[in-house]
Amino acid sequence: MLSIIIPLYNAELHVPSLIKNIKELDFSNIEVILVNDGSCDSTEALVTDFINSFNSVNLKFINKRNGGVSSARNVGLQNINPKSLYLTFFDCDDWFYSEVLNSFLVEIQSLPDPDLVLFNYVRNFGVISERIDHKLNGVFSLSENFVMLYTSGLIQPCWNKVYKTSLIKENHLRFEEGISMGEDFRFNISFLEVSKNVAAFSSSLYQYNSDSANSLTKRFLPDSFEYFKYGISKVNELCHLKGIDYPDIHNRYITALKDRFRNLALSTLSYKEKNILFYEDFSFVRNNLDKIKTGSLSPQDRIIYMFVRLNLPKFIWLAFSFHRLIKFESYK
């Protein structure tokens, strides 16, 4: 059985399309667990009506006090079917491809018992969309392709992955509660620490709606740089544990600085306040320049590196502002 856990919070606008999506699933080998995280709108009423009319033992609806997405997912994990072999986590404002899920348990039988299954996905920007393709197929060890998967942003989210249920149960893995961002990434790193192999399917499992108001690309995140630093340290630990060769991991500090600027642009802070925050992060990168491998930096990042080394934060600010050197790297 494949289990799908979907948290809901004030999701009345998304419930109709979610219901349509769920109806396309084959409930003979799939269960869906909807967790209402203390919604204040009509989410509960809409889902209750659907549950009563659909009448399937493999469609569960759980109400709980508001505690955040991690709390809701953890409640879902506590209520999965004992027969569950694999599970995944979706968001209610996105879209999943039911035909891929319906055939998953059949297709997985042709592979040698993977711990984690990685899919491609589609990123929807409203008017246009982009297919994110890992260009992999089959089973491989984590050390083979981890760096590519991490730097391309495919490791970070949960919704492009299917996890072996037994590994989560045996290792008592849960989402960290009480944090404002990065809960997917932290869970994935913990899962990868106990995983042996990964399978990649060439099909797209999921459509992530970047145009959603809840998308991290639309919100100012005060702790975004700290999250990036934490992520780099955790990846470094994972690489040591798994014997993954990633000598230029600290080059990601440049990426973190670029991302910080892009996120500051979303804030309502004054120009002075933005400069203060940016300079704090700039100073951290400058103090860690000795860890950066300049030979593997892109031409764009070498310019940023040069400004950091010369202690010219205002030049970076101007470069970001007027030449648009950065490309925001989303991690929902």
For the regions a language model picked out, list residue spans one by one.
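Membrane-interface aromatic/basic loop that binds lipid-linked glycans or pyrophosphate carriers
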Residues: 267-332
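Short, well-formed alpha-helical segments that are part of the catalytic scaffolds
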Residues: 10-24
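Donor-binding/catalytic cores of nucleotide-activated saccharide
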Residues: 92-201, 206-225
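A conserved acidic beta->alpha catalytic loop
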Residues: 36-46, 66-67
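Acidic helix N-cap motif at the loop->helix transition within catalytic regions
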Residues: 14-16, 41-50, 75, 99
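Short beta-strand-to-loop acidic/aromatic patch adjacent to the donor-nucleotide binding site
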Residues: 83-95
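Catalytic core of nucleotide-sugar-dependent glycosyltransferases
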Residues: 205-211, 218-247, 259-289
